[in-house]
């Protein structure tokens, strides 16, 4: 059973930092908005640099504070965004099931993780916009096969129709919580939201 926090400053048992990465336009910001506020915007949100939201959930009798960072997919922001990989405890790699190129680039994003994140970071592959079945070009079996190749979990989601969004974030949080219990000396490295790295959003076109 999960529920949004009524008081963001309330006590919590675990603080977990998650990171959303993937090409521009795959719907990372929409996934974050759906999970954190249970809302959806039909406008495409271009993240400038990096942005974050917080949601506290109840998970297996513990209060888990999720600090979720949304990164820009554009190459010109890569230096800024890769700086946040090191502190991530979990990373969601997002592609658009209607965009073959975004799926092909997942291997590049995984290489970025291998170069900049900790070895123990939990990962999950997300095929977003699964509600657009008539435009789908990346079959579910291909997503599952790629995830299996890297030994990570896979889900198809729709931020627009709220399909598997909750499940994706909660599943990753559960895996991280288990790892923290199994390795009690591991402390989360949390990037504090002190400096605004251009987190303002520009709205352009449709996103799911």
Swiss-Prot record:
Keywords: Cell membrane, GTP-binding, Lipoprotein, Membrane, Nucleotide-binding, Prenylation, Protein transport, Transport
Gene: rab8A
Name of the protein this chain belongs to: Ras-related protein Rab-8A
Record GO terms (molecular function): GTP binding; GTPase activating protein binding; GTPase activity; protein-containing complex binding
Lineage: Eukaryota, Amoebozoa, Evosea, Eumycetozoa, Dictyostelia
Family to which this protein belongs: Belongs to the small GTPase superfamily. Rab family.
NCBIfam families: small_GTP
Subcellular location: Cell membrane
Binding sites annotated in the UniProt record for GTP: 22-29, 70-74, 128-131
Pfam families reported in the protein's UniProt record: Ras
S-geranylgeranyl cysteine: lipidated positions: 207-208
Mode of membrane association: Lipid-anchor
């Amino acid at each position: 059973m999960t529920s949004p926090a009524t008081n963001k400053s309330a006590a919590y048992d675990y603080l977990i930092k998650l990171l959303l990465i993937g090409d521009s336009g795959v719907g990372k910001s929409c996934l974050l908005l759906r999970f954190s506020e249970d809302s959806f915007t039909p406008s495409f949100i271009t993240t400038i640099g990096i942005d974050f939201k917080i949601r506290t959930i109840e998970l297996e009798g513990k209060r888990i504070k999720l600090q979720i960072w949304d990164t820009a997919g554009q190459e010109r922001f890569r230096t800024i965004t890769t700086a946040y990989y090191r502190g991530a405890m979990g990373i969601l790699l997002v592609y658009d099931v209607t965009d073959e190129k975004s799926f092909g680039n997942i291997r590049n994003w995984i290489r970025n993780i291998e170069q900049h994140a900790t070895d123990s970071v939990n990962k999950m592959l997300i095929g977003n916009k699964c509600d657009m079945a008539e435009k789908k070009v990346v079959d579910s079996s291909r997503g599952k096969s790629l995830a299996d190749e890297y030994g990570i979990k896979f889900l198809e989601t729709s931020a627009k129709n709220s399909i598997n969004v909750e499940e994706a974030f909660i599943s990753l949080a559960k895996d991280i919580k288990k790892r923290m219990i199994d390795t009690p000396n591991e402390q989360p490295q949390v990037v504090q939201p002190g400096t605004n790295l251009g987190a303002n959003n520009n709205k352009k076109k449709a996103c799911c």
